[in-house]
Each structure stands twice: as C-alpha cells, then as structure tokens.
C-alpha cells in the first residue's frame, strides 16, 4: 500500500511540473503583447497531460492494494520520464526566452513574436517541432496509461465482486 502511495506521489510530482510549465507558458505568452494561439495550444497540450497524470495518481492512490510500484514503473517509466524531460526542456527554454526580452543588439530577440522567442530559446524550428512531437506523444501515451490504470481498477473490482459472490454462494450451500 505504501508502495502505491509513493508511486502516486511520483506521478503527482510530474503532473505538478507540467502545471508549473503551463503557468509559466501562459504568463510568458501574455507578457509579450498578448497571447499567441501557438503558445495557447502548447499550454493546452501540457495542461491536458498534467491533468490526466493527476487523475492517474488519484486512482492509483485510491486503489493502492492493486498496484505494485515495480510492475507499474517497468511498464510506464519511459512515458513518465519522457513527459518530465519535455516539461524540463520547455521550462528551460521559457526561462531563456523571458530573459531575452530585455536584451538588445546582437543575439537579442527584440521585435520577435512570442512564439519566435520560444523557438529561438529552444534552439530553432527543428527543436521546437521535436518538442511538440514529444509533447503530443506524452499526451497520447499518458492517455493510454490512464486507460490501463482504469482497466486495472475494473479488474480489481471484478475480482472482489467474484470473491464476494462465490462466498455468498458457498454460504448458502452450507446452510
């Protein structure tokens, strides 16, 4: 049981990192002459993934007896690590892009759109496309993880129901 609670806490930590990135991304988009559709879309993707991770963490915690940390990590470690890595890259780029807002002259980004600043901070259009693909993949895989966790919970419920039903039938037979 403590294993599953620790697992849930780890997932919450990754979800919190996503929420933090969304907050920073939203503030960044607003701070440079209003919001930008591409920034909003990126924030929406990260927000959705972080929300699903939070739901997974809650489900795992509420059904702790059915989840073994080792098995769960073996199956989903890459997905969670990928999300965490993508959030980290985005957070780092946002910090760099925010600092660039005050720079002038050579290497500065004055007069560049919000999206352009973020692309510049990531290292270029190719890196931005890679990050977007990674975030999309995280969202899809976290959605699959959510479905797998929900199926596990349904399986646990079915096992409990079957055991209870078998016990009731047995109790009726011995009367």
Regions found by a protein language model. Name each.
Residues 1-71, 75, 90-97, 109, ...:
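N-terminal amphipathic alpha-helical segments
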Residues 37, 41-44, 78, 85, ...:
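DHp/HisKA dimerization-phosphoacceptor four-helix bundle of two-component histidine kinases
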Residues 50-53, 57, 80, 84-94, ...:
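A structural signal for well-ordered alpha-helices, especially hydrophobic packing surfaces
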Residues 62-128:
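Charged, acidic
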Residues 105-175:
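Regulatory helix-to-disordered linker/tail regions at the edges of structured cores
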